[in-house]
Amino acid sequence: KNVMVDLFGSWINDLNYYWCKQTELDDIPVVVSRTGWSGEIGYEIYLRDGSRGSDLYEKIMEAGEPYKIAPTGPSQIRRVEAGIFSYFQDMRVTDNPFEIGMDRLVDLEMDADFVGKEALKKIRQEGIKRKLVGIEILGDPITMIVPPEYTPGYFVPDHWPVNNKDDEEIGYVTSKCFSPRLKKNIA
């Protein structure tokens, strides 16, 4: 957060979650979005001029030097702890909002029409056949070991089957990790 204040000024503190603002950073046109993939205070900076990528990178690294920032990827552990979905990992285009716990965002009683409204009404009436839920996984801490056949940077499927006491598959785990904060395996 301090790096963003140093780059853009104190207005960044007033940017609400999932809001964005078009602005410039030393004549580099950008869109700043208050988002994040880990549940922490996060921002995304989108270039509006792709030719200025190196300039933007250098500005960010320079502003981050006092804070010892370094390039990295998002934290899978923090994402799972925060309950933030990863598209294709936790949900797909074939899922509906009722299955993934987003039904609070769907108003089927509104006067306005939208694509899929009738299909969603039917699903609500008939009920869902599956539900995305959070669970605790007993046992030794889960490690995030990527099999050697996967190239770094590519999607690694890690869906684990979940069986009932009769060993019948009743679902699958989409994302999992050992949470150091909670001191247990979560999914």
Range-by-range predicted roles:
Residues 1-187:
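Conserved, structured C-terminal
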